[in-house]
Regions:
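Hydrophobic alpha-helical segments at protein termini of multi-pass membrane proteins
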Residues: 1-230
């Protein structure tokens, strides 16, 4: 029997939001020279969270359309990447505050972490409702170390595409944006597909790959910081 207690809700919210705020603090340091306005970062984060209840019925619709796993995962990935981009764009990317290449990556990662915070809260809440605190802690650890990083990486791929085309003409910017979306969607879908169809050792390898990509993202940030108008 499910018991929706105040303690379960508080633990799920803290478990979902606090770790993502730690990651947010970590990534915002990459933009330490010219930080974005706090109000726009907060808006991007909140809009990212608000995207989750929009994504859920859309993903349920996709799941009812087909039973082919890889198609479902790609459908879900498209929905989530588009919604995270919309959240980041509405939050700060459309404003004059986005005045340098790195800003798109910051806003997209912020929105992605907002999305991850709400999503993680729901996943952690499920076992807590049955009193299974251990499973809730395991879920928190897995999502902190894997799924949250995936959201960061996929949104950062789109942000990097925007960054590298920041000083280009509109046609080139659109082309880069499309390529960024394709990369993000493929990365997101393949991770979800493999993580659910791989044995424990394979899952470990996948998580190691995610961490290697995170290191690559740190190096990419340094490259983006050096982008200048030609």
């Amino acid at each position: 029997m499910f018991t929706l207690s105040p303690l379960s809700i508080i633990l799920a919210v803290l478990g979902g939001i606090v770790p993502t705020l730690v990651w947010l603090w970590f990534w915002l340091r990459e933009d330490g020279a010219h930080p974005e306005p706090n109000r726009l970062l907060l808006l991007s984060f909140v809009l990212g969270m608000a995207a989750v209840p929009v994504a859920i019925p859309l993903e349920q619709f996709i799941a009812h359309l087909t039973a082919i796993p890889i198609v479902v995962f790609f459908g879900w990935s498209i929905i989530e990447e588009v919604l995270k981009y919309v959240a980041a764009y509405a939050g700060g990317m459309h404003t004059q505050a986005e005045d340098e290449p790195i800003d798109a990556m910051i806003y997209l990662i912020t929105a992605a972490l907002g999305f991850a915070a709400a999503e993680n809260t729901l996943f952690i809440l499920q076992p807590l409702l049955t009193g299974d605190i251990f499973t809730g802690l395991v879920t928190l650890n897995i999502r902190f170390m894997g799924t949250t990083l995936l959201h960061i990486l996929s949104s950062a791929a789109i942000g990097a595409a925007v960054a590298f085309s920041f000083y280009k003409n509109q046609r080139v910017r659109h082309e880069f944006l499309v390529m960024g979306f394709v990369l993000a969607i493929v990365l997101h879908a393949l991770f979800n597909f493999l993580i659910l169809r791989t044995e424990s050792m394979g899952v470990f390898v996948i998580f190691v790959c995610i961490w290697v990509l995170i290191i690559g993202l740190l190096l990419l940030f340094e490259r983006v910081k050096r982008i200048q108008r030609a």
